[in-house]
């Protein structure tokens, strides 16, 4: 999206339902006026990415219809090494969710947040929702689909930058159809198949009937959760021991 709205007219003409400012670069242009963009665009504008309470609150006050959360956790992203910038995704989502709650009290407007990056398994999706996300954006899990145009490879949006690449091209392979990855039935035991089934089962286990209720479940930091009692899986490189 350029600093003016001229270049975005084509998007509106082609009936775009959402416009995102994700991964914009100045390229010698004037600073983008986010408030004017959100006000004048005519369609919902999703802004990102951010990882802190203060920035998320500023974006919401600028008129964002949604906020993307995550810097560096993506499977192909190298931003944390290149820029030294980033916050663990669970913390980032929780902090931005706190900003959303305060902004809703302030304005009466609820702004959805989308966890973007670091999501590989159904468990990752569940944890993002539990930390406060309304939705997730996934790359590498979908790149593993037989229908994906990358044919088993995945790369981030900043990877091909001619000035400062902040990503790499990784081989994620093909593990099944998009239907199997999203809805099952799963043929893998590591949580990378039937992602929606993972979320539904987790919500049922926690007694959450809606996403809103899932956002209210208790969250604890428990590193041993992934290793406790998994001696045989770890030794045999199965399931959670891979």
Regions found by a protein language model. Name each.
Residues 1, 78-81, 138:
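Glycine-rich, flexible loop/turn motifs
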Residues 1-7, 12:
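Single conserved hydrophobic/aromatic residue that forms the stacking wall/gate
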Residues 2, 47, 202-205:
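Short N-terminal micro-motifs specific to bacterial/archaeal maturation
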Residues 3-4, 38, 106:
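Generic structural signal for beta-strand residues in well-ordered domains
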Residues 13-15, 21-24, 50-52, 71-74, ...:
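Short, ordered loop/turn segments at secondary-structure junctions
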Residues 17-19, 45-48, 67-69, 113-116, ...:
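Hydrophobic faces of well-ordered beta-strands that scaffold small-molecule active sites
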Residues 18-41, 53-60, 74-94, 149-152:
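Active-site-adjacent beta->alpha loops and helix N-cap segments on the catalytic face
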Residues 41-42, 55, 62, 84-115, ...:
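Alpha/beta catalytic cores of nucleotide-metabolism and tRNA/nucleoside-modifying enzymes
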């Amino acid at each position: 999206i350029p600093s003016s709205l001229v270049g975005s007219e084509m998007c509106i003409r082609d009936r775009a339902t959402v416009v995102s400012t994700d991964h914009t670069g100045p390229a010698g242009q004037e600073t983008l006026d986010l408030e004017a963009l959100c006000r004048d665009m005519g369609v919902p504008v999703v802004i990102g990415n951010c990882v802190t309470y203060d920035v998320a609150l500023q974006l919401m006050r600028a008129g964002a219809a949604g906020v993307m959360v995550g810097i560096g956790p993506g499977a192909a992203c190298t931003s944390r090494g290149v820029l030294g910038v980033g916050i663990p995704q669970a913390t980032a989502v929780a902090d931005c969710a706190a900003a959303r709650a305060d902004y809703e009290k302030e304005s009466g407007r609820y702004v959805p947040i989308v966890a973007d990056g670091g999501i590989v398994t159904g468990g990752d999706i569940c944890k993002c929702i539990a930390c406060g996300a309304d939705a997730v954006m996934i790359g590498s899990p979908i790149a593993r689909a037989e229908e994906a145009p990358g044919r088993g490879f995945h790369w981030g949006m900043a990877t091909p930058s001619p000035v400062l690449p902040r990503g790499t091209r990784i081989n994620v392979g093909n593990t099944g159809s998009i239907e199997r990855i999203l809805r099952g039935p799963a043929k893998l035991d590591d949580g990378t198949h039937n992602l929606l089934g993972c979320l539904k089962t987790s919500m049922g286990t926690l007694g959450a009937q809606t996403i809103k209720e899932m956002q209210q479940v208790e969250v604890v930091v428990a590193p041993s959760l992934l290793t406790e009692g998994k001696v045989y899986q770890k030794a045999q490189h199965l399931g959670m021991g891979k």
